[in-house]
């Protein structure tokens, strides 16, 4: 049904190489993150310290560097069992109020240090109740941590705003309860709802009561779909459940045909997703780990960007994928020859798709994102001009 598109890399496009942003400019560029799991982004050192403080004794390593390596190797192992084990350890140390506050604060700090100016970070409150916390106490602790992290970032000269997405697990039966929780805290730091977990055997239609409730309440939600299970999960998420965004959505490529002459034909579902501007929360490094693509150069994001889908770049699980927003863009710059213009396109796409009011999204685009990229482009142009001038004088 589909033919994969392999976009040209920067190495095959010499004209683009001179415009390739440096790692430093990529880091300083204002970036927007829509798909990041709180329990997938802890600092290894924090895990070790929290395990000691909370009495969690199941860590595979107690040295922070060795533990970080273990997480990366487990995630890259190709074993679903080992991959899921990584989350048992992060969630295992996130069972107290103080731990949740700390993890959320450090998350905001780390993202801000990486140049992220707006982020929506998701977590499942139902997974943090083992030591007696209530759902409400979990949400309030995480919100407190995000606000503390924003303050620390400001003190360090960085600007970031973090909103929470409350996630319900697909295999459980608490989605309506979590949706109601998201609605109660929607003006107190929570910006939307999500469902996550194994797609196969747990279609989003099992949680229709939660989605129907959220639609009645005029609330926002995204659904993990089209990561592993393919087009049926995307179709159900959109047409049965009414999702505002697609968590991953990378398998929409299965409904796109690329012919030998380079022409492209979109199927009905792919056309609908593009025409309706449905945001795709693409996570390149994570997709490589799960087998959705064999390399960055073969990742569908190249074709989806060329076809003007509402594509966004995300991290998914920063610890497990050993990644950051800057690293994701570095990989894409190398694979596709992307410039600061491309980075701005992805960042504006993401900001347009955020679950905050229109005027606030517009202000972020016009007051933060566009000026930030304009400054970096001017800086690059000045350096290019100075370099050319210096070369001419030398030749003379």
From Swiss-Prot:
Coformycin and 2'-deoxycoformycin, whose structures mimic the transition state of the deamination reaction, are potent competitive inhibitors. The gene is add1. Belongs to the metallo-dependent hydrolases superfamily. Adenosine and AMP deaminases family. Adenosine deaminase subfamily. Homotetramer. Pfam families: A_deaminase. This is Adenosine deaminase 1. One of its GO terms (biological process) is adenosine catabolic process. It comes from Streptomyces coelicolor (strain ATCC BAA-471 / A3(2) / M145). The record marks 248 as: Important for catalytic activity. Catalyzes the hydrolytic deamination of adenosine and 2-deoxyadenosine. Keywords: Hydrolase, Metal-binding, Nucleotide metabolism, Zinc. Substrate binds at residues 37, 39, 197. InterPro entries: A_deaminase, A_deaminase_dom, Ado/ade_deaminase, Metal_Hydrolase. Binds 1 zinc ion per subunit.
